[in-house]
């Protein structure tokens, strides 16, 4: 597939290069933006998009129909309960979903069971280092016994605006800070797990997956600027060194590709 070269992914066999009509799963499609972008990115693909929310799926279906996109099918489904319904995908994408599960590794393992050998998977996970300030704010919210309602969210946000504490000032720089719904997702989400690069390396190994590369070109340029020209951009130990020297490079998420071997 042409995408492999464009994204500078390191894959280990010829399987992907010979796929003419890739079957793709979007696990946690939300309101459909992700699935529609993927459907347009891969030539002659068939996309299966799942989400737990009926409201999100209804919106996604409506927008997909409005845009005349014909190669996406939407289903309500739980990531942990897919094996009896779906199987044999060439590509699986799940960004911003696994870290909100009670057991993210179980969710990741469930997706991995649906991926064909040689297939690739894009995963998005929160960085522990990049979200240190988020953790401190969430701790305060818990201590103050605030609830995810409009009044408490506005009250906490106003407190932050008038604060000189570093973890508060860092939060103000987030584009999510100026929308109540985004602040709710950012700070009041009940369940959230964070990860480190060494932890991701260990999980990949346990699931029989190999790291193929990060998805963000800007982050790749940071790597190239820090290390020598001959440094291995697919070496997660070097990426860990880079993140330790710049804690906020994965402030959105770790978004990376891996391959089932």
Task: Describe the predicted segments one by one.
Residues 60-61:
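Conserved SAM-binding loop
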Residues 53:
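Conserved SAM/SAH-binding beta-strand->alpha-helix loop
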Residues 1-23, 37, 41:
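Conserved alpha-helix/loop element of class I SAM-dependent methyltransferases that forms part
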Residues 68-80:
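Conserved SAM-binding strand-loop segment of SAM-dependent methyltransferases
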Residues 83-92:
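A short acidic, Gly/Pro-enriched loop at the edge of an enzyme's catalytic core
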Residues 162-261:
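Rossmann-like AdoMet/SAM-dependent catalytic core
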Residues 105-117:
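A short glycine-rich, Lys/Arg-flanked "PGG" loop and its adjoining helix->strand segment in the class I
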Residues 120-168:
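Conserved class I S-adenosyl-L-methionine
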């Amino acid at each position: 597939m042409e995408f492999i070269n464009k994204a500078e992914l390191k894959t280990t066999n010829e399987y992907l290069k010979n796929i003419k009509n890739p079957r793709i799963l979007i696990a946690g499609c939300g309101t459909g933006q992700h699935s529609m972008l993927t459907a347009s990115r891969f030539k002659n693909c068939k996309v299966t998009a799942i989400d737990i929310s009926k409201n999100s799926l209804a919106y996604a279906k409506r927008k997909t129909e409005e845009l005349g996109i014909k190669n996406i099918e939407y289903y309500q489904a739980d990531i942990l309960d897919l094996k009896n319904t779906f199987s044999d995908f060439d590509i699986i994408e799940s960004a911003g979903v696994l870290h909100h599960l009670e057991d993210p590794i179980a969710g990741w393992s469930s997706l991995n069971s649906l991926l064909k050998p040689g297939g690739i998977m894009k995963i998005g996970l929160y960085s522990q280092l990049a979200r240190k300030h988020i953790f401190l704010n969430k701790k305060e919210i818990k201590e103050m016994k605030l609830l995810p309602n409009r009044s408490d969210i506005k009250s906490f946000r106003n407190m932050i605006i008038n604060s000189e504490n570093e973890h508060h000032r860092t939060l103000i720089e987030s584009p999510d800070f100026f929308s109540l719904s985004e602040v709710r997702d950012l700070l009041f989400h009940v369940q959230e797990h964070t990860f480190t690069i060494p932890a991701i390396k260990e999980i990949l190994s346990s699931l029989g997956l190999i790291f193929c590369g990060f998805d963000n070109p800007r982050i790749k340029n940071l790597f190239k600027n820090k290390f020598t020209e001959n440094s291995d951009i697919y070496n997660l130990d070097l990426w860990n060194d880079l993140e330790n020297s710049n804690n906020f490079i994965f402030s959105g998420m770790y978004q990376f590709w891996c391959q089932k071997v």
